């Protein structure tokens, strides 16, 4: 279908972004991205300003590892219904609202705690937010993919772009709200300014849930029928039909079905190649992202500077280049988009080395942030489109969660050592950013070997 897209004018290709369902996908992205503000930059800066070390903050980021394992409970989320809520607002939305309530309660708990005296409790609540966020992502991604028909490749890539725009909107604008609120309350003389900020962020969570009620949820009949057929097939192979065999069939169909389907569709070697690429692709970007706000603070930028350049300016750049990245993926193909974005990610990380070696410079900070966000936007939209096109609709939630989790595993578990790496380099931020640039190369080698054999819809 690539030839058809290339014959279209740019305005015809771009028109897909103005469909109603793209606005719904945008909101789902915002809901998914916002919790990262809470356990990312907000938590990091809260701990930093309470006097905790870079290494401690880096290791605290291990709570993000939860995102790497949400595929383990994705099959259950795909099947189990939330009492009352599922009947009222649908299966997917019922799960999202439940997890949003958990996040809201966690924010209220944070607002009563001093991190220096209760570090373990602060991190534990952060972990609860991460688990709730990772769980809602399973249904958010499934609901997003189900907004688009299975044979609509163009709309799937545009939907991926809108989801990424939404995610970064939730993350960047959420960051603008968090940083400016914290600075406002700090300057107003409140000692517990971060705790008050978390209550403000709770209002954003409530607003997102109101918006969610306008997102259409398709009837899950086909998915359920297909899952029942898989259960029956396993039950027949087990022989006698009783409670035990029905339970084994349900568990096997729930857990093994999605994995068998993935390997069957792609073949064993290609499936392993896909998993290797997904694991490695964004490791360098994660190392940079985990420590970036600490780096900005250490070279002399204030919270309002970071809010303006990294969050505000970064958000505008991300939105523009995500939409352009979506167009590039539609017109040039998702594989080419992956290669281009990988090279861009590595190149832009080097700009932070220049900033580290030259010292505090607002214009250089702005340039580094713009180009880094441009590369991250291209990379993320290509990556989301890539794994969205690999999933089987029978197991949408589970397969997407599995692929996204493997990508997150590389980024979260390994990137937790980012603070320790900076300490090991004696605070040489320049060398640290050079190392993050080199980290993308293994994933591109993986992609090169499997690119001609991929089964993309």
What do the predicted segments below correspond to?
Residues 2-19, 105, 111-123, 135, ...:
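Intracellular loop-helix junctions on the cytosolic face of multi-pass helical membrane proteins
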Residues 7-67, 272-277, 281-295, 299, ...:
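Helix-loop boundary and gating motifs at the non-cytosolic
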Residues 66-73, 308-330, 341, 348:
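Transmembrane alpha-helices of Major Facilitator/SLC transporters
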Residues 94-116, 343-360:
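C-terminal ends and interior cores of transmembrane alpha-helices
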Residues 336-383:
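C-terminal transmembrane helical hairpin of 12-TM major facilitator-type secondary transporters
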């Amino acid at each position: 279908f690539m030839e058809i897209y290339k014959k279209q004018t740019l305005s015809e290709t771009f028109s897909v972004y103005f469909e109603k369902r793209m606005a719904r996908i945008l909101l789902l992205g915002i809901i998914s991205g916002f919790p990262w503000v809470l356990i990312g930059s907000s938590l990091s800066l809260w701990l930093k300003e309470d006097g905790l070390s870079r290494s401690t903050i880096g290791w605290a980021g291990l709570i993000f590892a939860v995102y790497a394992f949400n595929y383990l409970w994705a099959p259950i989320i795909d099947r189990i219904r939330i009492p009352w809520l599922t009947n009222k607002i649908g299966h997917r939305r019922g799960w999202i609202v439940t997890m949003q309530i958990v996040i809201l309660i966690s924010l209220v708990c944070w607002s009563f705690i001093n991190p220096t005296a209760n570090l373990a409790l602060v991190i534990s609540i952060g972990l609860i937010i991460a688990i709730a966020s990772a769980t809602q992502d399973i249904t958010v991604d499934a609901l997003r993919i189900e907004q688009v028909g299975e044979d609509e490749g163009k709309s799937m890539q545009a939907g991926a772009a809108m989801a990424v725009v939404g995610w970064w909107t939730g993350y960047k604008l959420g960051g603008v709200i968090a940083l400016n609120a914290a600075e406002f309350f700090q300057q107003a003389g409140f000692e517990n300014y971060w705790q008050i900020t978390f209550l403000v962020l709770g209002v954003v969570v409530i607003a997102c849930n109101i918006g969610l009620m306008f997102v259409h949820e398709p009837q899950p009949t086909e998915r359920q029928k297909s899952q029942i057929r898989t259960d029956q097939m396993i039950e027949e192979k087990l022989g006698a039909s009783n409670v035990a065999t029905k339970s084994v069939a349900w568990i096997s169909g729930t857990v093994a079905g999605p994995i068998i389907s993935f390997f069957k569709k792609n073949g064993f070697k290609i499936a392993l190649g896909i998993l290797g690429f997904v694991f490695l692709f964004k490791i360098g970007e994660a190392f940079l992202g985990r420590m970036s706000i600490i780096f900005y603070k250490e070279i002399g930028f204030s919270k309002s500077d970071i809010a303006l350049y990294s969050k505000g300016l970064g958000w505008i750049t991300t939105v523009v280049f995500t939409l352009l990245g979506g167009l590039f993926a539609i017109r040039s193909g998702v594989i080419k988009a992956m290669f281009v974005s990988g090279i861009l990610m590595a190149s832009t990380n080097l700009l932070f080395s220049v900033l580290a070696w030259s010292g505090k410079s607002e214009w250089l900070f702005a340039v580094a942030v713009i180009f880094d966000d441009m590369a991250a936007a291209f990379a993320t939209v290509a990556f989301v489109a890539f794994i969205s096109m690999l999933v089987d609709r029978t197991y949408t939630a589970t397969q997407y969660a599995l692929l996204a989790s493997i990508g997150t595993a590389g980024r979260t578990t390994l990137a937790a050592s980012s603070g320790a790496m900076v300490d090991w380099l004696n605070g040489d931020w320049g060398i640290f950013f050079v190392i993050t640039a080199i980290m993308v190369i293994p994933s591109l080698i993986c992609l090169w070997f499997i690119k001609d054999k991929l089964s993309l819809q």
